[in-house]
Amino acid sequence: DTTRKVAEVLTASGVDFGIMGKKEKSAGNDVRRIGEEGLFEQLAEQNIENIELCEFEEIVTTDPHTYNTLKNEYPKLGGDYTVKHYSTLLLELIESGQIHLSKKLDIASTFHDPCYLGRYNGIYDAPRRLMEQCGVELVEMPRNRENSFCCGAGGGQIWLQEHADMTQRPSEQRIEEAVGLGVGTFTVACPKDMNMYS
C-alpha cells in the first residue's frame, strides 16, 4: 500500500518514473539473512539483468531492507546504482517546491527508526524532516536514532509464531514505549515495521 501511495504522489507531482512490474523480484535480503547465499545471488543476478534494461537515474524503494541490499550488496555483484529511500525523495520534492502540501496534518507523532534505514545507512533526518514538513510535531522516544530499538523482524521474529514461553515480543516493548509518550500516532518507514507493529 505504501508503494502505491508513493506512486500516486509522484504521479501527481509530475515525476517521471516507472516500475519494473512482473520483472521485479525480491532483492534477496531475507533469503540472504537466513543463509541462502546461492538463492540471493540468483535473485540479484536476475534483478541486475532486468534493471540494466531500464533507463533511469536512480532507484527509489519503500523498503529499507531492499534499500540496503541494492545500495550496499548489489555493487559487489555488478549492480552499482544510486538508490534512495522514498522519505529522502519526497523531502527533496517538497523542499524544491515540486510537491506543494495544500494542508498540514497538525498532529503529534513519534517515529521508529528502521534498522536498515538508520543504524545501517545513517538516514535519520529525512523521515523526521518529512514529518515536520507535513505538519507533524515529532515526539521522540527515549531510544531513537543510533540507539533505536529493533522491531524484531530483521532478526526473524516476523516469521515466527508466538510461543507460550515468549513473555513479550520486541515490537510490544516498543509500542509500550511509544504509548508512554501520550501521542496518538506511531510513524514507521518500513513495511516490516508496519507488520510487526500492527
Label each residue range with its predicted role.
Residues 1-198:
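Iron-sulfur cluster-binding electron-transfer modules in prokaryotic oxidoreductases
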